[in-house]
Amino acid sequence: MQAMIFAAGLGTRLKPLTDTMPKALVKVGERPLLDRVIMRLKEAGASHIVVNVHHFSEQIIDYLQTNSYGISIDISDETEQLLDTGGGIKRAASLFKQDEPVLIHNVDILSNVDLASFYYHATANNSTTTATDALLLVSARTTQRYLIFSEGMRLMGWTNVSTGEVKSPYAALQGLRFEVPSETNPHALQHGYHLYAFSGIHAIAPSALKTMQEEEGEVFPIIDFYLRHCKKLNFQGEVKRDLKLMDVGKIGSLKEAEAFVQLRES
């Protein structure tokens, strides 16, 4: 397995902690977020990880040089310019093997996902006649922004249910209004489509990386890339119905995150 950890973010929602350190080194249960994600990936079988850096990049580099994980870890340096999630993958693409998917994991996400199984599905799907160009881990979590999938779980678009905005290359989705899925039946179809929340964990195949390299532009979100190309490339969603996920993006979520890891580690 090869993987990438998004650790370049500014961590503005974790201020004042991130006034003096990168979000990746904020501790949950006495361990930095970066350490937790690296160990999760290593335990899942990752032998090579790329970590992108920007905010207080030297602290992350020093941390990785000081702590040995027994696997190959490379740095993708965005110190001069933050490239956003899609641009970050594009910059780091040359550091990966070109014949297998890359598992992407946000540094501030804690979950109960079986990463080895998820990566296996991405790899297996990539070898079929209907190859999957990216596999996105999604769930029925309540939010305001959802990815829109066909009944067969192919990515079709994105919507903000608060504003009614829809982004999609498919004309059939234009003008449709979606609602927050029902708590009692969150997997029900709306206008023939599923709505699921993105988890910040996904696997991108070499075919999609090649398309990304052919595009102009260096700074762009990965979701925008997926939406631009979901008509010609096969981006699939994988639903984990019992997903337990913590987005450790706000000061107020740290105590909840500590309880989350204590429960998982008990």
Predicted regions and their residues:
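Conserved N-terminal catalytic core of the sugar/cofactor nucleotidyltransferase
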Residues: 1-5, 27, 31-106, 115-117, ...
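Active-site metal-binding loops of divalent metal-dependent hydrolases
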Residues: 10, 107-109
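N-proximal low-complexity "stem/linker" segments adjacent to membrane-targeting elements
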Residues: 1-16, 25
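Conserved beta-strand segments of alpha/beta enzyme cores
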Residues: 24, 72-74, 234-236
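A generic "binding-loop/recognition-motif" signal
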Residues: 10, 21, 56, 79, ...
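A short, conserved acidic/glycine-rich loop-to-beta-strand motif
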Residues: 127-140
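Catalytic-core segments of class I nucleotidyltransferases/pyrophosphorylases
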Residues: 100-103, 110, 116-127, 142, ...
